Amino acid sequence: MTTFEGRFTDTADLRIAVVVARFNDLVTSKLLSGCLDCLSRHGIDTAETSSQLDVAWVPGSFELPIVAQNLAQSGRYQVVITLGAVIRGDTPHFDVVVAEASKGIATVARESGVPVIFGVLTTDTMQQALERAGIKSNLGWSYGLQALEMGSLMAALAQS
């Protein structure tokens, strides 16, 4: 029996794209900071001149899938991370955006064969979003870690 697992130290050949929603950027910028901190601490060059990392900003979480698809299909990246924050309001808009973003991101991963990390917070309040983006913990770090694991796992599967 063969066991396949991603390793968090196999980062030398990893190229990652991060797509960040500008809407609720008070939250998403903190998620991005946590994500970049994780990637940097695990050996990914996160400098502005990095050849391992690119960041694309989109207007909101609804736009994440199309840009993630473009990046995943480019052949330049082993992993794409999507970061967004959708906070419930008084209208059904929340449900529409969350459903379409999650379905779209999952479809990109399935159709491209490139792991796409779903880093979209879905919360009832801004306070809950901020707690998940740095006040209590920063899920951006977790999304970075997921990307490293999936990139390494996909490389291991390709070599088997």
Swiss-Prot record:
Output the InterPro entries linked to this UniProt entry.
LS (IPR034964), LS/RS (IPR002180), LS/RS_sf (IPR036467)
Which Cys-Cys disulfides exist here?
Answer: none
Q: Which residues bind 5-amino-6-(D-ribitylamino)uracil?
A: 23, 61-63, 85-87, 118
Locate the active site.
93
Residue positions binding (2S)-2-hydroxy-3-oxobutyl phosphate: 90-91, 132
Give any Gene Ontology cellular component.
riboflavin synthase complex
Write down the top EC class of this protein.
transferase
- What sections of the protein cross the membrane? none
One short Pfam family name for this protein? DMRL_synthase
UniProt keywords (A-Z) are: Riboflavin biosynthesis, Transferase
Q: Which GO terms describe its molecular function?
A: 6,7-dimethyl-8-ribityllumazine synthase activity
Give the pathway.
Answer: Cofactor biosynthesis; riboflavin biosynthesis; riboflavin from 2-hydroxy-3-oxobutyl phosphate and 5-amino-6-(D-ribitylamino)uracil: step 1/2
A GO BP term, please? Answer: riboflavin biosynthetic process
Q: Give the E.C. number(s).
A: 2.5.1.78
Give the matching Gene3D superfamilies.
Lumazine/riboflavin synthase (3.40.50.960)
User: What's the catalysed reaction?
Assistant: (2S)-2-hydroxy-3-oxobutyl phosphate + 5-amino-6-(D-ribitylamino)uracil = 6,7-dimethyl-8-(1-D-ribityl)lumazine + phosphate + 2 H2O + H(+)
- Domain of life the protein comes from: Bacteria
Q: Which family does it belong to?
A: Belongs to the DMRL synthase family.
Biological role: Catalyzes the formation of 6,7-dimethyl-8-ribityllumazine by condensation of 5-amino-6-(D-ribitylamino)uracil with 3,4-dihydroxy-2-butanone 4-phosphate. This is the penultimate step in the biosynthesis of riboflavin.
**Which NCBIfam families did the record assign?**
lumazine-synth (TIGR00114)
This protein is called 6,7-dimethyl-8-ribityllumazine synthase
Q: Which organism is it from?
A: Parasynechococcus marenigrum (strain WH8102)
Its lineage reads: Bacteria, Bacillati, Cyanobacteriota, Cyanophyceae, Synechococcales
